[in-house]
Amino acid sequence: TDSIVLIGVDNYLGATHEFYDSFYNYIKKNMKKDQIVMDLADTYAARWINSPRRNTFLEELIYQGKKLYLKDLWVPSTEDYIKIGYTEEELQWAEANEFYIWQYFVENELLYSTEPKLLTRFINPGPFSRFNLELDSESPGSIGRYIGWKIIRSYVKNNNTSLLQMLQMDAQSIFNKAKFKPKN
């Protein structure tokens, strides 16, 4: 049914709870009660957004960005690092390195790549994002979600489009009109 939400409270006992001793830290960090609303918002957002064909990395970035943007609207008083499931330090790293992350994606021609491993490297949860560089261990996981969020925010700032129209737009149209350009 569409009117019932089941929440496994055993997923939110706190990052240091003994039940999670065998879990990796990148998973444990979000197993706390303030993440319940974020997880519900993420699940609900997925129902509002046309699921991409997921043929290109850009389509996945935009899809993830749309989900995070809905959190901006639904829980505006929540800190960004909580919305994306980062620590404060991880979000600071992403913000400080946004230009270089984007440069890496562009220079390595990842945006139109259909390589499935890009999801593992940059979208899916992990201890860090996998650029295959020395700085990998410094980066937060799922950095592609952050970049997608920034693209959507840039699109919304630079275009007068309704929320519903934006959610239904294809990734390429959003990207073309977003005017996304991280500062160095």
Model-derived segments and spans:
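A cross-kingdom marker for long, charged
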Residues: 58, 62, 67-184
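Acidic/His-rich structured neighborhood in mature extracellular/periplasmic domains
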Residues: 1-91, 168-171
